[in-house]
């Protein structure tokens, strides 16, 4: 585990973004942990989150030309990542986002910011079912651009609803032949729990969940 990944997990726990206990997910599964990126809800938290995203994409070595933040949650994440790449890594890249509703006045259209051209890095919080990414792919293809990869905060490393199914992330990687980069995966969360005296109590439940639903 990289230092920035350990820092990110600590940061997510401190902000209440990553919690341990018993949570019912939309899928109906009972999960021993829950991740809610909406709680990165202050200026300093968002700035710090952008730095973690930037570290992850730099670490990956991915080549891309423009950052795209899908509406709505991806918009501040894309902006924060673009700022961090410029300020921390001297990579001043264009970024843009989409509107859910097209405007028929002013500049019009559904895209705001830099032109969506070349190799596009999509920035979002998590991939749950992959539906949002499929919508984004249509936007990118309509601009004759190419998706370079997706950058997310957490990879749950969890398969879909059917037995033996791929995870939503693996499906995205397979269907669009692009990588999904995460700041951390469940594997690193398990490693963090094993090393933390206070949180170690949650390790057996998370391990059991991984054994049941993991990929």
Swiss-Prot record:
Coiled-coil intervals: none
Enzyme class label: transferase
SUPFAM superfamilies named among the record's database cross-references: PRTase-like
EC number: 2.4.2.10
Keywords linked to the UniProt accession: Glycosyltransferase, Magnesium, Pyrimidine biosynthesis, Transferase
Swiss-Prot/TrEMBL cofactor(s): Mg(2+)
GO BP, sorted A to Z: 'de novo' pyrimidine nucleobase biosynthetic process; 'de novo' UMP biosynthetic process; pyrimidine ribonucleoside biosynthetic process
Positions bound to orotate: 34-35, 128, 156
CDD domains linked: PRTases_typeI (cd06223)
Record pathway: Pyrimidine metabolism; UMP biosynthesis via de novo pathway; UMP from orotate: step 1/2
Binding site for 5-phospho-alpha-D-ribose 1-diphosphate: 26, 72-73, 99-100, 103, 105, 124-132
UniProt GO MF annotations: magnesium ion binding; orotate phosphoribosyltransferase activity
Catalytically driven reaction(s): orotidine 5'-phosphate + diphosphate = orotate + 5-phospho-alpha-D-ribose 1-diphosphate
A UniProt-annotated Pfam family: Pribosyltran
Record's GO cellular component terms: cytoplasm
Function text: Catalyzes the transfer of a ribosyl phosphate group from 5-phosphoribose 1-diphosphate to orotate, leading to the formation of orotidine monophosphate (OMP).
Family from the record: Belongs to the purine/pyrimidine phosphoribosyltransferase family. PyrE subfamily.
Quaternary structure and partners: Homodimer.
Protein's UniProt name: Orotate phosphoribosyltransferase
Gene coding for it: pyrE
